[in-house]
Structure formats: structure tokens, C-alpha cells
């Protein structure tokens, strides 16, 4: 299942998972974090 209410800096797959409602991809990497 998906994890919601993630703190800034935690890995995410979509913005809805983050407290800040923003899932940002790091440049040059496939990982995204809140």
C-alpha cells in the first residue's frame, strides 16, 4: 500500500503522499522526495 503524510525529504512516488503536497524529483536521479 501507499504511504501518506510523508515529511519533507522522505522518498515518494506522488505528491499526494507528502504533507507539503509536492513530490520533487532530484535532478539526474529517478528518485523523488517530498
UniProtKB/Swiss-Prot annotation:
**Tissue expr:** Expressed by the pancreas.
Single GO MF descriptor: enzyme activator activity
Matching InterPro entries: Colipase, Colipase_N
Give a GO cellular-component term. Answer: extracellular region
For the keyword Lipid metabolism, the answer is yes
Domain of life (superkingdom) = Eukaryota
Tell me, in a sentence or two, what this protein's role is.
Colipase is a cofactor of pancreatic lipase. It allows the lipase to anchor itself to the lipid-water interface. Without colipase the enzyme is washed off by bile salts, which have an inhibitory effect on the lipase.
Task: Output one GO BP term.
Answer: lipid catabolic process
Complex formation: Forms a 1:1 stoichiometric complex with pancreatic lipase.
Subcellular localization is given as: Secreted
**Stored Pfam families:** Colipase
| Family stated for the protein in its record | Belongs to the colipase family.
Task: Provide the disulphide bond pattern.
Answer: 12-23, 18-34
Q: Which organism is it from?
A: Gallus gallus
Q: Entry's Gene3D superfamilies?
A: Lipase, subunit A
Task: Write out the entry's keywords from A to Z.
Answer: Digestion, Disulfide bond, Lipid degradation, Lipid metabolism, Secreted
Q: What is this protein called?
A: Colipase
Amino acid at each position: 500500500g501507499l504511504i501518506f503524510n510523508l515529511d519533507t525529504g522522505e522518498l515518494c512516488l506522488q505528491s499526494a503522499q507528502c504533507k507539503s503536497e509536492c513530490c520533487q524529483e532530484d535532478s539526474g536521479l529517478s528518485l523523488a522526495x517530498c
